[in-house]
C-alpha cells in the first residue's frame, strides 16, 4: 500500500508540473470617467485585446490586468490588439500581461494618449522611436517591474534618465535590482536594471559613458528629442504670435498718430494765444470792415452812401480806443 501511495503521489506531482496555471485576465473600458468590466479572450496563450465587438464608440481608456503570470516571464504570453481602436484611447494600462516588446502596442499610441501603464511585464528594450514619442507628448509612463537590459538599444533611455537626474531623479536602493525613478510633476518613469553592481546614479553615469564611447552616433539623442519637442510646441503658436505682433503694431501706430495730433493741436493753440494781433472790440453803434486787412489801423473806410439806410462805417483812432477802454473799466 505504501508503494502504491508513493506511486500516485509522484504521478500527481508530475501531472501538476505539466499543467499550466490557469491564466485569468480582465480588462476595463473607460467611458464618461467610469470603468466597465469586460471579458478577455485567451486563445493558445494569446490575449486578444480588446474584444472588438464589445468596445463602446466613445471609449476613452482601456485597462488589462492578468493574474497568475510571473512578471519575470515564465509564462509565454503574447498580445493581439486592434491598433485603430487603441489610437482613440487617452488611457492605456496593460499590467501583468507578459508583454515582451513595447512595439506590440506602440502602434496604438496616438496623439490623444495621456497615460501609459506597462508594469509587471517583460519589457527588455525601449525603442528609440517609441521613447521619442513618449518624450514629445510628455506622457506619464509607468515601466517599473520589467526586465530592461543593458546594451546599445537602451542607450537613449540611459541618456534620458541621466539628464532627468540632474534635477529631480530619486534613487531608491534595492537588494536585487537597482530601481531608478524620476518624477516631474505628474510624470513618472520607473526603470529596473538587471545588470550592474553600482548604485543607480553611478550605473547611469557608467553606462552613459559606455554608450558615448561605443556608440557615438547616439550621443545627442536626448538633446535632439527635447529640441524637437520644444520646436514642435512653438510651431503651434506661430499663427497666434503673428496675430499678436500685427495687433501690437497697429495699436502702436494708432497711439503715435493720436500723440502727434495732440501735440500739433496744443502747439497751434499756444501760437494763437501768443499772437501780436490787436483785435478791436465791437462797439454797438459802429460796424467795422476788416476785409483784406490784418491790422485795423490800416483798414480803409468803405463808402456806404450809395446804399440807403446804410450805417456809417468809422474807424476810431488810438486815443478814442484808449478812452473807450478806460470808460469800460
Swiss-Prot record:
GO terms for biological process: symbiont-mediated suppression of host innate immune response; symbiont-mediated suppression of host toll-like receptor signaling pathway. LRR repeats lie at residues 112-133. Residues 32-239 are extracellular. GO terms for cellular component: host cell endoplasmic reticulum membrane; host cell Golgi membrane; membrane. Residues 1-31 form the signal peptide. The chain crosses the membrane at residues 240-260. Coiled coil: none annotated. Keywords: Disulfide bond, Glycoprotein, Host endoplasmic reticulum, Host Golgi apparatus, Host membrane, Host-virus interaction, Inhibition of host innate immune response by virus, Inhibition of host TLR pathway by virus, Late protein, Leucine-rich repeat, Membrane, Signal, Transmembrane, Transmembrane helix, Viral immunoevasion. Residues 261-329 are cytoplasmic. Highly glycosylated. This is Transmembrane protein I329L. It is a single-pass type I membrane protein. It is found in: Host endoplasmic reticulum membrane; Host Golgi apparatus membrane. Viral TLR3 homolog that probably prevents TLR3 dimerization and subsequent induction of IFN. Inhibits dsRNA-stimulated activation of NF-kB and IRF3. Contains putative leucine-rich repeats (LRR) and a C-terminus cysteine-rich capping motif similar to domain structure of host TLR3. The keyword Glycoprotein applies. Glycans are attached at residues 32, 39, 44, 76, 82, 101, 185, 219. Disulfide bonds join 195-237. Its main location: host cell. Gene3D superfamilies: Ribonuclease Inhibitor (3.80.10.10). Induction: Expressed in the late phase of the viral replicative cycle. Belongs to the asfivirus I329L family.
Amino acid at each position: 500500500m505504501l508503494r502504491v501511495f508513493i506511486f500516485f503521489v509522484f504521478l500527481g506531482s508530475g501531472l501538476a508540473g505539466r499543467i499550466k496555471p490557469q491564466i485569468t485576465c480582465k480588462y476595463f473600458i473607460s467611458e464618461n470617467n467610469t470603468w466597465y468590466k469586460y471579458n478577455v479572450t485567451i486563445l493558445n496563450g494569446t490575449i486578444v485585446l480588446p474584444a472588438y465587438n464589445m468596445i463602446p464608440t466613445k471609449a476613452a481608456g482601456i485597462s488589462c490586468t492578468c493574474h497568475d503570470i510571473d512578471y519575470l516571464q515564465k509564462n509565454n504570453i503574447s498580445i493581439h490588439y486592434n491598433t485603430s481602436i487603441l489610437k482613440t484611447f487617452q488611457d492605456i494600462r496593460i499590467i501583468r500581461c507578459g508583454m515582451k516588446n513595447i512595439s506590440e502596442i506602440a502602434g496604438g499610441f496616438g496623439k490623444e494618449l495621456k497615460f501609459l501603464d506597462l508594469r509587471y511585464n517583460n519589457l527588455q528594450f525601449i525603442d528609440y522611436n517609441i521613447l521619442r514619442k513618449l518624450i514629445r507628448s510628455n506622457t506619464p509612463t509607468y515601466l517599473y517591474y520589467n526586465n530592461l537590459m543593458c546594451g546599445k538599444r537602451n542607450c537613449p533611455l540611459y541618456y534620458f534618465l541621466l539628464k532627468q537626474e540632474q534635477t529631480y531623479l530619486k534613487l531608491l536602493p534595492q537588494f536585487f535590482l537597482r530601481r531608478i525613478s524620476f518624477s516631474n510633476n505628474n510624470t513618472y518613469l520607473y526603470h529596473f536594471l538587471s545588470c550592474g553592481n553600482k548604485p543607480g546614479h553611478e550605473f547611469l553615469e557608467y553606462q552613459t559613458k559606455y554608450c558615448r564611447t561605443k556608440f557615438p552616433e547616439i550621443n545627442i539623442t536626448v538633446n535632439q528629442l527635447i529640441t524637437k519637442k520644444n520646436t514642435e510646441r512653438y510651431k503651434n503658436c506661430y499663427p497666434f504670435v503673428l496675430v499678436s505682433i500685427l495687433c501690437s503694431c497697429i495699436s502702436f501706430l494708432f497711439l503715435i498718430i493720436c500723440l502727434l495730433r495732440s501735440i500739433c493741436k496744443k502747439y497751434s493753440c499756444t501760437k494763437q494765444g501768443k499772437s501780436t494781433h490787436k483785435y478791436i472790440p465791437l462797439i454797438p453803434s459802429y460796424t467795422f470792415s476788416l476785409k483784406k486787412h490784418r491790422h485795423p489801423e490800416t483798414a480803409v473806410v468803405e463808402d456806404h452812401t450809395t446804399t440807403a439806410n446804410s450805417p456809417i462805417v468809422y474807424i476810431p483812432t488810438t486815443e478814442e480806443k484808449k478812452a473807450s477802454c478806460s470808460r469800460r473799466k
